[in-house]
Amino acid sequence: MRKSNWKVNVNGQGMPVNDIINRFWMSRGIENPETFLNPVGNILPAGELKNIDKAAMTFNICKNMPSPKFVIYADVDADGCSSAAILYHYLTAIGVEAEVYINKKKEHGVKDEFFLEDRHEDCVIVVDSINDTMEQYEKIWAQGKQLIILDHHIPNATILENAESLNLVSSAIDYPNPHLSGSGVTWKFVKYLDFINGTNIADNLVDLAAVGIIADVCSVGPDSMENREICHMGFRNLQNCGIRAVVNADEMIAESVGFSIGPLVNAANRMNQNQLALDLFLTDKFTEAKQIVKDLTKIKEEQKKLAAELFENFETMVLEQQDNHCYYFMVDESYGTLGGLLATKASDKWKRPCIVVHDTPMGYAGSMRAVGVENFSAIVNSSGLGECAGHENSAGIVIPKENFEQFKTYIESQLQTLDFTPMVEVDLYLERMQITPFLLQKVKEINRISGACFPPVSVCIENIKKYTIKKLSQGKHLCVETPDMKFLVWNFNKWEDVCEEGILHAVGGIDESFFMGKRTNQMLMQDFIFQPTPKVTALW
């Protein structure tokens, strides 16, 4: 059954393809589609990143030491791994010894464990993993080591006051493109090093920057043309063995990151296999990269199985809080890294804010995901009873135990008047017969660089009759097949919503598949409703 309200922007029924596409661009507010799709000249001067000149000077001083060694301290997510790989490959290309250190689980920032072993490095470069206090940085200085920080998170007042001494280069500090990811900042740093040192290395590392931008859900909309241009360059210049091993092609698109690379890294984080995810981007051997992809795929399947088992318990927990506007789920600490995945599944299923936490010394900590709310993080942070860090409706959360009951009461009071049925904005309303190869080509061009602030093209098709219901992969996936098109939902489990005979109305992304020489139009359904065919009783 339909889970959302649909708001269609363009009724394209009866229109030729070019008119449909023109109306689409108008609805998205894009005045010059050609320069938007193929951006050139939008890379901002690296000098606009504060402290980049000082950081580069520190880098060069260390590089010119006898037998220099750098340690790169990486965040655990795809943006962090990409950032580390950019620096690692740059350093090895100029013949400098480099080692990458990565945290365990989903930890962020320099941790005490880093100091248990002296690696005899001259310089520590922290990428995409900034701390909230000076304590760890002072330890690095106390050991006589130089420090550089490349980041994109908003620093707090203490860090901001010390930005110059920290050699902090961040897109979050007065930079015209605050949406630039950690990998984007790192790429611009090595691009700057190319400029001042007369090398030419960074352009063949831009694919890593593109991966980080898409994976970290940074804007690729008209408000960040620099990000779009980095993706434009990176998608067409695949040099990294790990990226090529995943996408198995000479070029990639945003979907390659969102549905392939990102999920593999995320699964490794949740299953405490961060080093393997990092190695995917560090290796320069394609055969090794292919084996890592196989290993990561196996880890992802293990994660999926474990999450499914845990999610079964959520059904019971919901029975005790059905009248709540926000659902709470407690998991064992050993499964804490799965909190984000489980919260996503829960909010998608029950269409409301969902909080998944485990018991920690700080209190109840974990993840929240929300739908039907403009900014759930702001609601949490305004309570004074808990704290969110992350995006508006996708963030980490900490609630002191002594505040938990009061926190729940406060959240409930803030959500009382809200309708949690999400509004799905649909780009185009079309008939099935309008899904031609020419239209699909245009849609693919648009979707090549898509993501935050510029989502892929969505289409509504209604009144689909004479279909056949198929269960794919032993009932894991739904396929509604008509003579000219397939409508698909991956990992489907709501079979009670399926009607064998009726009328289907669907919203989703359109594409085409090729199998045994046959081309088939398809839609990956984001939302749908089956309207049963009324039964007619004969009267005589």
Where are the predicted features?
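Nucleic-acid-binding small beta-barrel platforms of the OB/S1 family
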Residues: 1, 186-188, 373, 535-540
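Non-transmembrane, aqueous-exposed alpha-helical and coiled segments at domain scale
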Residues: 417, 421-423
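Beta-strand/loop nucleic-acid-binding surfaces
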Residues: 483-498
